[in-house]
Amino acid sequence: MSETQNTQVTKRQRTLVGKVVSNKMDKTVVVLVERRVKHPIYGKIVMRSAKYKAHDESNQYNEGDTVEIAEGRPISRSKAWRVVRLVEAARII
């Protein structure tokens, strides 16, 4: 009982998948995340959306790309998410 156990508690990161709608800022992309929600009274399925600014260190993601973002520590006043990976590249027409 005199031994101390070294237990690590890992906090699970919150991740979302969305589409890049803007990459005009340096090292930042704006990601649109859409989700489906059932209306509490009428029961209809409605789309809710939110835009998140995410950190893109190498400026490699373009508009239309589908990316996965993860929440982290605040990088700036409005940016606390970072791009984890590219899910699907935008189709060039």
UniProtKB/Swiss-Prot annotation:
Q: Does the keyword Kinase apply?
A: no
Q: Name one Pfam family in it.
A: Ribosomal_S17
Q: Does the keyword Nucleotidyltransferase apply?
A: no
A single Gene Ontology biological process assigned to it is: translation
List all membrane-crossing ranges.
Answer: none
Coiled-coil-forming residues are: none
Query: What UniProt keywords are attached to this protein's entry?
Result: Ribonucleoprotein, Ribosomal protein, RNA-binding, rRNA-binding
Gene Ontology terms: cellular component: cytosolic small ribosomal subunit
What molecular functions are annotated in GO for this chain?
Answer: rRNA binding; structural constituent of ribosome
What exactly does this protein do?
One of the primary rRNA binding proteins, it binds specifically to the 5'-end of 16S ribosomal RNA.
Family to which the UniProt record says this protein belongs: Belongs to the universal ribosomal protein uS17 family.
Give the matching PANTHER family. 40S RIBOSOMAL PROTEIN S11 FAMILY MEMBER, SMALL RIBOSOMAL SUBUNIT PROTEIN US17M
How would you summarize the oligomeric state and partners of this protein?
Part of the 30S ribosomal subunit.
Q: Which NCBIfam families match?
A: PRK05610.1 (NF004123), uS17_bact (TIGR03635)
What's this protein's name? Small ribosomal subunit protein uS17
Q: Which organism is it from?
A: Bordetella avium (strain 197N)
Q: Which gene encodes it?
A: rpsQ
